[in-house]
Swiss-Prot record:
Record protein name field: Trans-aconitate 2-methyltransferase
Subcellular location(s) per record: Cytoplasm
Reaction catalyzed: trans-aconitate + S-adenosyl-L-methionine = (E)-3-(methoxycarbonyl)pent-2-enedioate + S-adenosyl-L-homocysteine
Enzyme class (EC, first level): transferase
Main localisation: cytoplasm
Any one Gene Ontology BP term: methylation
Keywords per UniProt: Cytoplasm, Methyltransferase, S-adenosyl-L-methionine, Transferase
GO CC list: cytoplasm
Disulfide bridges in this chain: none
Tagged with keyword Lipid metabolism: no
Gene: tam
Function comment: Catalyzes the S-adenosylmethionine monomethyl esterification of trans-aconitate.
Length: 252
């Protein structure tokens, strides 16, 4: 996969950071020593962790060299490691694993989530936020355009669902707090929606296409967005963006 673009990702930095702020506010820990930020990206979520626990040893993990470089530049007091979340092993048990908008990219959550819980200290916390927009028009239309243009399905899998995650984490020995929030982001245009998803959800669909194929894909995608995202009275567009939040505290 081609590398992530930190500048494009940070174009909507405030909107992307807000769920991390709200997830962190629900973490029931006072003092922590060892923290991992899984899928840390350019370090915007890591900065929140460092602000709350400045004395903690915080390690950001990301598979993107560009994102890791950006994070290291922004936060020299934190450690950053280029690695696959599924294979990374901490040097010691963790007090907090924080994963903001990262685990949705990985398969087999029935194995992944218990594995992450096993990396925690007793009373340690796994805090997760994942976009839950597989059935939103933004993502449905990606699949429809791909089908029209004879491209294979390259999108991520849908999330397992609230009840499944509750059972997975309860059986792994956790107390579970789980909720879902839909944000309505004010967007100035359909092109702004495309700019948003190009940095994330559209990446798998576009990465192997030629420049001309990408343009055809995006032109058709823009046309279909016009049907699903009408203008408000003031000319803005409301982009519904559901997100699933989980705070699981290890009790065993």
């Amino acid at each position: 996969m081609s590398d992530w673009n930190p500048s494009l990702y940070l174009h909507f930095a405030a909107e992307r950071s807000r769920p991390a702020v709200e997830l962190l506010a629900r973490v029931p820990l006072e003092n922590v020593e060892y923290v991992a930020d899984l899928g840390c990206g350019p370090g915007n979520s890591t900065a929140l962790l460092h602000q709350r626990w400045p004395a903690a040893r915080i390690t950001g993990i990301d598979s993107s060299p560009a994102m890791i470089a950006e994070a290291r530049s922004a936060l020299p007091d934190c450690q950053f490691v280029e690695a696959d979340i599924r294979n990374w092993q901490p040097e010691q048990a963790l007090d907090l694993i924080f994963a903001n908008a990262s685990l949705q990219w990985l398969p087999d959550h029935y194995e992944l989530f218990p594995h992450l819980v096993s990396l925690l200290n007793p009373q340690g916390v796994l805090a997760v936020q994942m976009p839950d927009n597989w059935l939103e028009p933004t993502h449905v239309l990606m699949r429809e355009v791909a089908w029209e243009q004879n491209y294979s399905d390259r999108g991520r899998e849908p999330l397992a669902g609230v009840h499944a995650y509750y059972d997975i984490l309860s059986e792994a020995g956790c107390e579970v707090d789980i909720w879902r929030t839909t944000y309505y982001h004010q967007m100035p245009s359909r092109q702004a929606i495309i700019d948003w998803v190009t940095a994330t959800g559209l990446r798998p669909w576009l990465q192997d296409l030629t420049e001309s194929e990408q343009q055809l894909f995006l032109t058709r995608y823009h046309q279909m967005l016009e049907e699903q995202y009408p203008l408000q009275e003031n000319g803005q567009i409301l982009l519904a963006f559901p997100r699933l939040f989980i705070v699981a505290r290890r009790t065993e």
